[in-house]
Amino acid sequence: MRDESAKGSRLKANVLRFALALAALAGLAALNAGAQSAQDPAPQRPSITGISHVGYFVSDLPRALTFWHGLLGFDQPYTLKKKGSDEIGIAFIKINDRQHVELFNEPPTAPPNLMSHVCFTVDNVEQMRAYLRARGFDLKPGNGAKTQAGDYAFEIKDPDGTLIEFVQTLPTGMEAQAAGRFLPDTRIANGIYHVGFLVGNSEKALAFYHDVLGFKEIWRGSSSPSVLSWINMQVPDGSDYVEFMLYAKLPATFGTQNHVSLVVADAQRAISVLEARPAYKSYGKPLEMRVGKNGKHQVNLFDPDGTRVELMEPGTVDGKPVPSSTAPPPVHE
């Protein structure tokens, strides 16, 4: 009995020593993990270099192509088919080698909003996903899915629900493969200047675009001295910008507010060129050059669905910058 009691005591002692050893190992592992975590810096945001593209829904693709190709003079280098169909799902309108407009041949997902999304170019999609994940966005590690056009890309939503895409252009993708081609002299403009879209809460929008994405505020404008109308936010590593179209009450139609602005050297000459084209007869709307609140010449056109395409000169009419508005933003209803 004494031997069995001694064996039991030794067994209990061994179990206790083993448990203490496991606890010590666990504590050491936790300590090492904490030290490693302290050493590893938070993921850094990769470069956001510009606007890659903007997408719009169209109800009649042939008419939309007449507008973009016949009137504005841009080429359609490639298309994507609808799933399980030979029908065109997306038509790509090439603006330059790094920018395009996507025409979605389908009903809008959230009418009357005809803007599908806006996409920004980044130099590393995997790093962008890691950066946003560290900022609380629900994103899995990795490059994300390859698009049908052959590039790495993923999407999130901004505070207003606008779909925001980030793309890393790959050498094997359709855009890179088309570099240097599909750039006819008929193009009325050679670049996307900015993209404008509705924003209801400017404070939340600034927290997202400035605090998270690193965009820089470059100008504020007002159509009225009592309330702010627009905030321009430039990408952190380029010259392209987005324009917050501020509102208190959501408008009944979005087409005038949600727009793409194309840069032209001479707005009056652009009007003359457009009016001389056969497609202008079917366009059927007068073209008028105006001076915007930002002091720049601009011309507004509308696609067959009412989405605004703005032609804008890059400089002010007198060469002097227009001061930013100090009016308060509208109170979102």
Whereabouts are the PLM-identified features?
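Bacterial N-terminal signal peptides that target proteins for export
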Residues: 3-20
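Bacterial N-terminal signal peptides
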Residues: 19-30
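Vicinal oxygen chelate
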Residues: 36-47, 49-59, 91-94, 107-191, 197, 219-222, ...
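Ordered, small/hydrophobic-rich secondary-structure cores
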Residues: 40, 54, 72-76, 80-150
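Core segments of cupin and vicinal oxygen chelate
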Residues: 46, 55-100, 134, 196-241, ...
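Structured core of small recognition/catalytic domains
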Residues: 203-206, 210-290
